Amino acid sequence: MSGQQERAERQREELSASASPPSRFVLGLDVGSTVIRCHVYDQTARVRGSSAQKVENVYPQPGWVEIDPDSLWAQFVAVIKDAVKAAGVQMNQIVGLGISTQRATFITWNKKTGHHFHNFISWQDLRAAELVKSWNNSLIMKLLHGATRVLHFFSRSKVMLTVSRFNFSTQHATLRLTWILQNLSEVKRAVEEDNCCFGTIDTWLLYKLTKGSSYATDYSNASTTGFFDPYAMRWSRLITTMVSIPLSILPPVKDTSYNFGSVDEKIFGVPIPVVALVGDQQSAMFGECCFETGDVKLTMGTGTFLDINTGKNLQHVNGGFYPLIGWKIGQELVCLAEGNAGDTGTAIMWAQKLDLFTDAAETEKMALSLEDSEGVYFVPSFSGLQAPLNDPCACASFMGLKHSTNKYHLVRAILESIAFRNKQLYDMLQREIQIPVTNIRADGGVCNNAFVMQMTSDLINEKIDRPAHFDMSCLGAASLAGLAVGFWADKEELQKLRQSEMVFKPQKKWQEYEVNMENWVKAVKRSMNWYNKT
């Protein structure tokens, strides 16, 4: 071939390339409790560009946890722009945005002006702890439980059984919103004037992205607020009436994978479709491809969340695990049962602030350098103790400290406490959920710690699959968005794209840990009811 022919061939190839449509991508964004992160995904589910910023929580008083909405909005916009730039693509190549968020963190704002009345009140916030205790011990709750137990006896209704076991929690938005109405007159007045909007982070971001033209949430987020009736698939008139919250301030509830509207062009230069809103744990479940009944996900991030796919049916539980909507896509409805421990990554970050180590990655080697923690035990309870103990007044503590205790013992005790809490949650799942476990898949930043992963596998005597990609909430949001716009054909295609990095198998028997865990449980019991004011 002559030089002239070669040049002509190259020109034809260049023209052909320029004529072909540009590659398409989807965005998966997760607003976690610690980090806000965005990934750009191609059609092989490979991350092409990323950006992350630390979520700056505000602590106005002990036990209060807030997020500045203006700061969060600036971070949200920045990580999307930076991720797209890092991917080396253009905004007009983004065909869909999926948003995963920490759940039950809420805000209220002026319906007419869009201005917020206060900061986001985090799901970790404990300002309503006394209100929760008061309500759970109230005559109203005792009458409700008694009446529904009788009704369940005669009707065998699952709804009545669930209501008979219902208790308020500080993690629900319910009584934190009640606290706001009792203490912020501006919000109370706006509610009375029908000028107040309530929203979890997903709802507020959608409202901001669409310049107020879209106001909605999805079923996964709604089901974690404490206001939602998952049996009737609507906001609960019973709960809202009990706590005097008008239904009018709650947003419409839509499918998880759904066209919620397009981003206002002024924000990113193009109208990117917002096609998925999802709670972070449900999103991680979807990202892990836990699509079958019995599939289990163990997320270890800021907190630990253990979820099991219960199929189309909600599980009526005994107050440890709680029923949730996993996702709703058209006619497909998937339900979950979930249990959680509030302080996992939180405990590790706290230890880092104390200069016990400089990088969380060091903790694995520190723990493995010792035979044991030398009788030191840590209770991870900065935000109270969740199921099966359910004590918002518990305190975080070290017990068993000695002259010989050093930072290595403290670090190992912290990591062991995470594994012990995992064991408690898994045992509770086995007791309460009458569904055989098929697979266990882990995700979240703490699952990068092989010491915690191996100890958890030993304690529960099960294999645990760790994926190649840890940011499952981002991937789940992107997957849901991709399905909505035809970027991926179906869930079967997503399953084929999933990659496993390592499977942890039990190496020690439970009996080798039994005495250690019994002593840890003693430490936990001594930390309970510490902040009780009555």
UniProtKB/Swiss-Prot annotation:
Expressed predominantly in sebaceous glands. One of its GO terms (cellular component) is cytoplasm. PROSITE patterns: FGGY_KINASES_2. Glycerol binds at residues 103, 280-281. ATP binds at residues 33-34, 302, 345, 445. Its main location: cytoplasm. Its EC number is 2.7.1.30. InterPro entries: ATPase_NBD (IPR043129), Carb_kinase_FGGY (IPR000577), Carb_kinase_FGGY_CS (IPR018483), FGGY_C (IPR018485), FGGY_N (IPR018484), GK5 (IPR037444). One of its GO terms (molecular function) is glycerol kinase activity. One of its GO terms (biological process) is glycerol catabolic process. Skin-specific kinase that plays a key role in glycerol metabolism, catalyzing its phosphorylation to produce sn-glycerol 3-phosphate. Involved in skin-specific regulation of sterol regulatory element-binding protein (SREBP) processing and lipid biosynthesis. Belongs to the FGGY kinase family. This is Glycerol kinase 5. It comes from Mus musculus (Mouse). The lineage of its organism: Eukaryota, Metazoa, Chordata, Craniata, Vertebrata.
